[in-house]
Structures are given as structure tokens and as C-alpha cells.
Design a protein with these regions (language model features):
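Active-site beta-loop-alpha junctions enriched in small/polar residues
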Residues: 18, 23-30, 46-49, 78-80, ...
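A conserved active-site cap/scaffold subdomain adjacent to cofactor or substrate pockets
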Residues: 71-82, 86
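Histidine/acidic residue-rich metal-binding segments in metalloenzymes
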Residues: 1-42, 55-70, 92-110
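Histidine/acidic-residue-rich catalytic or RNA/ligand-binding cores of hydrolases
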Residues: 31-37, 53-58, 83-96, 116-132, ...
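Mid-to-C-terminal alpha-helical segments outside catalytic/metal-binding sites
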Residues: 126-164
Length: 164
């Protein structure tokens, strides 16, 4: 969880207009943020633990709470966050996580988080140029409007509403 200083920092950060990111927190730290936060926050690169049991992926109760608070959840493209068998992920794994988020009513909270900073990426997303392919896969699976919401609209709306 958060230290006493960390708990005290949450409202100070919010007051300063700094968005909190819970992607690297354990479950106890997440609960501490829920207790201290008064504004929406982000999980900049997190997937669904129900689909892949990585400890930094979000539990369903965390997703529901983020939906309730109108937070933003960025899909993580890292292999280990998409599947747990050591094999390379593909678009089907990203779509499974997306579908799970959508079943939890997170359609307005979901965005792209990526994690392009040196992690192990699946071949289907090992460069920014392949975002067009991801957009096509999302549109084919969930429709163009949902795909566009995930690709840019949700993030744009969140940042417009929550940044000074």
C-alpha cells in the first residue's frame, strides 16, 4: 500500500492538477488511492486480470470502481500482460481484454496505453505503424464507433475534463 506520506500526497497532487496513475500499484496501494482520491485517475497501461492473471492487471472490482469514478484505463500491449503462457500475443488477446472491459461497462473509460518503452511487444504491435491494424481489428470486432472511442475519443474527453 501507500506510505503515510503517499496517502497525504494524493490530495496535494490532485490540487496541483497532476493526474494519478495506478498502473504500478499493488491492490493495497490501489485501495489507498480509492480512499484518498477525490478526482478521476488513470491506469495508463493495465489489462484485465480475469483474462491474464498478471498482478498489475486490474481486478474486476478495480475496473468497476474506475468506471464509477469516470477514470481512464489504457490497454497494455506487453506480452506478459496480455497472456501468461510465455507465448507471443496477437490481436485476439488484445480483443479478449477489450471485450472483458466492455462487459464491465468500461467502454467510455478504455483507451490505448501501449507500453512502448522497451517491454516485450507482440509482433502485431511492435511498432507505432501497426496502430492502423489494431484500429481495424477493434472496428471489426466491436464496430467503428467503439473502436474510435478506444483509439482516441475517450482519452481526449478524459484529458479535456481532468486537466487544467
Amino acid at each position: 500500500g501507500l506510505s503515510p506520506l503517499g496517502k497525504a500526497a494524493v490530495p496535494a497532487l490532485e490540487e496541483a492538477g497532476i493526474l494519478l496513475d495506478v498502473s504500478h500499484l499493488n491492490d493495497a496501494g490501489f485501495r489507498d488511492v480509492l480512499e484518498a482520491a477525490r478526482k478521476p485517475f488513470v491506469a495508463s497501461h493495465s489489462n484485465a486480470r480475469a483474462v491474464c492473471p498478471h498482478l498489475r492487471n486490474l481486478e474486476d472490482w478495480q475496473i468497476r470502481e474506475m468506471v464509477r469514478r469516470r477514470c481512464l484505463i489504457g490497454l497494455n500491449f506487453s506480452n506478459g500482460f496480455l497472456r501468461n503462457d510465455g507465448e507471443k500475443a496477437d490481436f485476439s488477446h488484445i480483443l479478449r481484454h477489450t471485450e472483458h472491459f466492455l462487459t464491465l461497462e468500461a467502454g467510455d473509460c478504455l483507451a490505448l496505453g501501449s507500453d512502448f518503452d522497451g517491454t516485450s511487444l507482440p509482433p502485431c504491435l511492435d511498432s507505432c505503424e501497426k496502430m492502423l491494424d489494431l484500429g481495424a481489428a477493434l472496428a471489426a470486432a466491436f464496430g467503428r464507433e467503439t473502436a474510435e472511442n478506444i483509439l482516441w475519443r475517450n482519452a481526449q474527453a478524459f484529458f479535456r475534463a481532468n486537466l487544467p
